[in-house]
């Protein structure tokens, strides 16, 4: 299982709201580095294969949103959802799911995901390069705990969802045994 001691350096291309931008779409590009995102903070990051996909949309992201307050109450400063998608897709997906408390982090070129050892080929599904599903607790840039779904490989037949879920992460932070993945939080259509 790939495991680093600290998060790798990467630059993320994000879009931020800026009322000084004229027009009906007041957003501008802003680069964010790994250091800006992780240094001096306790962060839960969960990574998934793609926005608008079944498990990601019905359970993975919605459950982290649902448990946001409890994770924060246990010392987490920020929860991040990362996917090898662009900033526009991540914004619209978060908006579609009503994710108000999760930072939607686009890794459009897969640079961070590649350095994490989690970039996989999913051409068998027409996805191209994507992130393998995992979650991690990062404290001041150092990876304290990482939950990687089994079977990490290119063109995997399945999409396991057993350990990177919000309930497992919360159980780890609380120091208790996880009870397993919760049932889907929303219906997936498509």
What residue ranges belong to the model's regions?
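Chalcogenol-based redox active-site neighborhoods
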Residues: 1-190
């Amino acid at each position: 299982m790939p495991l680093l001691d600290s998060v790798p350096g990467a630059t993320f291309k994000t879009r931020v709201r800026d009322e000084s931008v004229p027009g009906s779409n007041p957003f501008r590009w802003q680069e964010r580095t790994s250091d800006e995102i992780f240094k001096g903070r306790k962060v839960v990051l969960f990574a998934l294969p793609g926005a608008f996909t079944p498990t990601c949309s019905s359970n993975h992201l919605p459950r982290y949103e649902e448990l946001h307050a409890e994770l924060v109450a246990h010392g987490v400063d920020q929860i991040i959802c990362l996917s090898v998608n662009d900033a526009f897709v991540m914004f619209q997906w978060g908006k579609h799911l009503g994710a108000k408390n999760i930072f939607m982090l686009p890794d459009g070129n897969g640079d961070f995901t590649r350095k994490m050892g989690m970039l996989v080929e999913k051409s068998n599904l027409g996805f191209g390069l994507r992130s393998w599903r995992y979650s991690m607790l990062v404290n001041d840039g150092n990876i304290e705990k990482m939950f990687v779904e089994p079977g990490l490989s290119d063109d995997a037949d399945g999409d396991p969802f057993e350990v990177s879920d919000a309930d497992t992460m919360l159980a780890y932070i609380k120091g208790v045994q996880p009870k397993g993945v919760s049932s889907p939080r929303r219906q997936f259509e498509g």
